[in-house]
Amino acid sequence: GDTIALTMPTYPAYKNMLKALDINIVEIETTKETNYQPTAELLENSGKKFDGIIITNPSNPTGAMINEETLQDICNWCDNNNVRLISDEAYHGITYETPAQTALVHSKSALVLNTFSKYFALTGWRLGWLITPENMASRIKSLAENLFVSPPTIAQHVALQSFNHMDVLDGYVEQYRTNRDILRARLPELGFGDMSSAQGAFYFY
């Protein structure tokens, strides 16, 4: 079977999902020095072979982000090495310093995942989207029809209405920022000094 690389730490459920699909997994460790995110150099020097890689930007569980130059390098590395990039962008919109860059800017072969559960605050409605290269669209559509048919109509209507209330959603992000700043100031006083930068999402690591 195919082999997918996960850059650690990562969203824990990925392992279970991939194992359920009988996909082999290799792990590539990131560190604070790489901002708990992969780099093209890290992938090149990993010594591991894989057909695809999943990245999360901003990251769950670290809140760390991949800057634009590094993301471009990763996209180029994947294209040059025939590795499918799968970019989980669920936390786009929840950033505190610079906006998160989408892999679509740098790659025509990447798969991009997103959801209405995070920035749009529709957790529980289980609605999201996938952006795929055109040559994969029909196969993914066939797969989707056999897994969940289609999302509920009411969830789609609610999601569309959320675009009319971006000011409210941005207000949520400002509240997340306030909470992050409080924690970033207080946690070191409690002994949690060596933390991730928490540039996005709502996690410290």
What are these language model-derived features?
Residues 2, 23, 80-84, 108:
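A short helix->loop->beta-strand "cap" motif at the edges of active sites that frequently abuts
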Residues 6, 27, 55, 87, ...:
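Hydrophobic residues in well-ordered beta-strands that form the structural core
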Residues 134-139, 153-174, 186-189:
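Amphipathic alpha-helix from the class-I
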Residues 160, 176-187, 194-205:
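Conserved glycine-rich beta-strand-loop-beta hairpin in the small C-terminal domain of fold type I
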